[in-house]
Amino acid sequence: LYDTNYGLSESTGPGCVHLGMENIHKVGAIGVPGYRWECKIVDEEGNTVKQGDVGELCVKGPGLMTCYYNDPEATAQTLRDGWLFTGDMAMQDEDGFYFLVDRKKDVIVSGGENIYPVQIENFLSAYDKVKDVAVIGLPDKRLGEITGAIISVKDGMECTEEEIDAFCRELPRYKRPKKII
């Protein structure tokens, strides 16, 4: 058996839990809301998003902090209407399981599209020649930012930019790295 718990020091408890072997098909999930905990995912305006859409994960439950010590501004940004805004970007699947996507501040905005580097990093990590990868936002006059991928190739292997481009054809065009290093 295994279990995964998701929580923050500000929540002092498992906002989400993922227990038992019956959930093995939910690899990568942080789980479902823990006992007496609630979760929701919201957009930039604080509105709940549709299931399957990405937004900021908010948690509510026993053990939630009351404030940041001597920092009312940070408290007001993080705690709103009894909800803790975690700064974690997440999505909920059709079975109610939550998956972390990235940190809110790690978003690349390219031509008005939100791109989460960890999604592209996970995708590129599946390529058999890739040892490690980091995806970053690079300034672009027309689009604001473009994606760049810094790739470390496995020992004894060679990999061309063309190979990576071909592999990335499975990604939506706006998510494909425009610069490969």
Label every model-predicted segment.
Residues 7, 31, 88, 112:
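Active-site glycine-centered loops adjacent to acidic/histidine catalytic or metal-binding residues
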